[in-house]
């Protein structure tokens, strides 16, 4: 009887110890940024006064999982969209959409777009390195995907006339450009991504962090639709020896069951963060992130009104956005935008997280 009681106590102690190391994790982050037009106008009429710019993006991620003794495992859903364009392309679109006068010249027309939706599982592990406050966290996500777009349109268009030279490389699960070559069955995509984070707790007050998201990101699709080819102006001589041109169009497409296999990739994003605890009431952050050609730098001020809780505010360059948030060890939420009237905003972000220890 005594032996049984001791065994039961040992099992209970082991379970209690294990449960204490187990955490439920959840996070959600959604951000959108556009140049040349506010977000609403960019997606709709393109009728806001034109500003300079050459990029737009939205990154959205939902995660739910558990963490145990440094291992994190869970489910993930993502929607990413990245667009690069020439400022001349934005001007051409603005003039066309609003029935304004064109100059008699060639307009540079360049669009590079990538879009994907994925659902999968992730695994991460915190590696305590060298006992010097350094933690290295590799993270691998395996996912499936049935929706993506990968497009490049490059060339020039003369004024508002149907003249010019354009090269097109377009791969898709659904044809949103030509609206004629959507595969009868959705493509089947499987892929993976690799993220890496290094944290260094320099001392009790100073912490540094370097992150690379989508350091590797590759998806292989089967049954992909495509449109590849070019338009150009072909000169010929009319009677009287005058030279005129007419447009020529040459495209290869996936029509009539010509779908193919395709490998799709997203570009990496890089982050460098510095956090400093000034005293019991105040701490400061400097966050730097680079997305393709865009670099954002943000500074935050935290006010700690208890041992666990703080409120913070920050300003970010490039997006010119202000962030407000509240956070503690187990919960946090923040919003960030450059305009209170979201109809006029070029940037908007919301994110939250919580951790629940058993």
Positions of the model-derived regions?
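N-terminal signal peptide c-region/cleavage motif recognized by signal peptidases
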Residues: 14-17
């Amino acid at each position: 009887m005594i032996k049984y009681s001791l065994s039961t106590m040992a099992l209970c102690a082991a379970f209690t110890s294990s449960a204490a190391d187990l955490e439920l994790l959840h996070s959600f982050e959604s951000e959108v940024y556009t140049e040349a037009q506010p977000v609403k106008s960019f997606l709709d009429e393109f009728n806001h006064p034109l500003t300079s710019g050459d990029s737009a993006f939205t990154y959205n991620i939902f995660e739910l999982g558990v963490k145990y003794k440094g291992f994190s495992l869970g489910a993930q859903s993502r929607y990413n969209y990245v667009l690069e364009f020439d400022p001349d392309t934005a001007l051409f679109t603005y003039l066309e959409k609003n029935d304004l006068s064109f100059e008699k010249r060639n307009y540079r027309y360049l669009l590079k777009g990538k879009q994907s939706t994925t659902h999968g599982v992730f695994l991460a592990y915190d590696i305590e390195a060298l006992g010097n406050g350094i933690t290295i966290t590799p993270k691998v996500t395996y996912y499936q995907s049935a929706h993506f777009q990968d497009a490049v349109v490059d060339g020039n268009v003369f004024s508002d006339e149907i003249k010019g030279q354009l090269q097109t490389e377009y791969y898709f699960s659904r044809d949103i450009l030509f609206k004629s070559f959507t595969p009868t069955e959705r493509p089947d995509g499987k892929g993976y991504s690799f993220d890496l984070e290094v944290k260094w707790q320099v001392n009790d007050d100073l912490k540094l962090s370097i992150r690379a998201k989508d350091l590797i990101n590759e998806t292989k699709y089967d049954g992909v639709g495509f449109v590849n080819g070019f338009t150009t102006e072909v000169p010929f001589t009319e009677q009287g020896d005058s030279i005129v041109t007419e447009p020529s169009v040459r495209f290869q497409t996936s029509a009539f069951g010509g779908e193919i296999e395709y490998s799709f990739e997203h570009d990496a994003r890089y982050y460098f963060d510095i956090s400093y605890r000034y005293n019991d009431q105040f701490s400061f952050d400097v966050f730097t992130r680079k997305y393709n050609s865009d670099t954002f730098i943000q500074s935050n001020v935290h006010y700690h009104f208890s041992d666990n809780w703080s409120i913070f505010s920050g300003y970010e360059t490039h997006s010119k956005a202000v962030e407000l948030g509240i956070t503690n060890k187990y919960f946090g939420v923040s919003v960030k935008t450059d305009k209170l009237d979201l109809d006029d905003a070029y940037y908007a972000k919301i994110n939250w997280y919580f951790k629940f220890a058993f």
